[in-house]
Design a protein with these regions (language model features):
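Hydrophobic alpha-helical segments
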Residues: 1-70, 124-127, 138-148
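Acidic, low-complexity N-terminal propeptides/linkers enriched in Ser/Thr/Asp/Gly that mediate export
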Residues: 2-4, 24, 72-175
Length: 175
């Protein structure tokens, strides 16, 4: 069943056509999350032999955060989505930050202060953000692990490394 002997006929491929919201997207995400409205395709519509990607990318999570399935997306809204530099709630980055912030840093004043700084991060990677460097360096290994095949350190260790890097190279954690 997993060996392909040909192509699936076009008419048998699950399709999302003219969704209620009028908005279809693909951000290298699972195909059953392709619109911001209520009429997405369903996982059970796809045969397992199709070998679909089943994880969500941060881009697709952010698109779903930035749209509501009701409001019209004008040119400005589409450009804002295209150039968005944020991490989504529930993304890998968000989970790493949550793990770091759940740790008790009270025995290490420098790390406790850094954790307070990280807690103020709005998950945006804007160039003017005083929190983005610490946040980005804390989450980068977890996010890139599946591509680099380099095991990511535990969140607390990644955070320590980020703090050390910024202190060494910039003399501060908020360059």
């Amino acid at each position: 069943d997993l060996i392909w002997n040909g192509y699936r006929p076009y008419g048998e491929v699950p399709m999302l056509v003219n969704p209620q919201s009028g908005f279809v997207f693909n951000a290298n995400n699972q195909p059953y999350d392709a619109t911001d409205g209520p009429d997405n395709l369903r996982l059970e519509d796809f045969p397992i032999s199709m070998g679909l990607q089943t994880d969500q990318t941060n881009r697709s999570l952010r698109i779903m955060e930035l749209t509501d399935g009701i409001a019209k997306n004008d040119r400005a809204a589409l450009l804002a989505m295209k150039f968005d530099s944020g991490y989504a709630k529930g993304s890998q980055a968000d989970k790493v930050v949550a793990a770091v912030l759940s740790h008790d840093w009270s025995g290490e004043p420098e790390m406790e202060a850094a954790a307070e700084h990280l807690a103020a991060w709005d998950r945006q990677m804007d160039k003017d953000s005083r929190h983005a460097a610490l946040g980005g360096l804390t989450v980068v290994h977890e996010i890139t692990e599946r591509f680099t095949k380099i095991p990511a350190p535990e969140p607390q260790e990644a955070f320590r490394q980020a703090v050390a890097y910024l202190k060494t190279h910039y003399g501060r954690i908020d360059p």
